[in-house]
Amino acid sequence: MTIFAVFLLAIALSMDAFAVAVVSGCALQKPKVCHYVRLSAAFGFFQFAMPVIGWWLGVSVREYMEAWDHWIAFVLLGWIGGKMALSGLRALRNRESCACPSVDPTAGRNLVVLGVATSIDALAVGLSLAILGTPIWADAAIIGIVCAVITACGVYLGKTLANLCALNGWAELAGGLTLLAIACNILREHQVF
């Protein structure tokens, strides 16, 4: 696979991470450097690690993984999206102004769950690369680095949108609903409904 093809693949794999980063930046309103670093590093790491794991798993579990990957991503994104939406509704109900979300998408368990959920596709790519007999390390590194950069851009875009719209609790609600929509779209893409 050429470097250009790997780069395009990395961009495609980073789109879920970009969407989550925009939502996170919007919900946080004024993300700090630590938010950029944590989200970019986590998403970049998982986008690097998942193809490597998929490559090592190889063909032996491919059919099993393809049968369940969309359900895993759906549950993880749905869980975080639901928490964000409920937090946004609470902020709106309590008429909190300029409140940061009570659910920090860049910390703790939320960060790990989002990292895994946005990189499930990369696991399948690793399986595919194993079938093609492609060496994994350089490709996985490119995928991880591209995802980290795209994630940082997404957080910045989300911050800009939040500042322009002064969204407050609406941003967190919209972010949660967006994650729920992404989760449902994953099931739609796998023809569940």
UniProtKB/Swiss-Prot annotation:
Chief location: membrane
Top-level lineage group: Bacteria
Molecular-function GO terms, alphabetical: manganese ion transmembrane transporter activity
Localization, UniProt: Cell inner membrane
Keyword Transport: yes
Membrane-topology annotation of the record: Multi-pass membrane protein
Annotated TM spans: 3-23, 41-61, 69-89, 107-127, 130-150, 164-184
GO cellular component terms, A-Z: plasma membrane
Positions in coiled-coil regions: none
Signal sequence extent: none
Record's keyword annotation contains Ion transport: yes
Keyword field: Cell inner membrane, Cell membrane, Ion transport, Manganese, Membrane, Transmembrane, Transmembrane helix, Transport
HAMAP family: MntP_pump
Function field: Probably functions as a manganese efflux pump.
Similarity comment text for this entry: Belongs to the MntP (TC 9.B.29) family.
Name of protein: Putative manganese efflux pump MntP
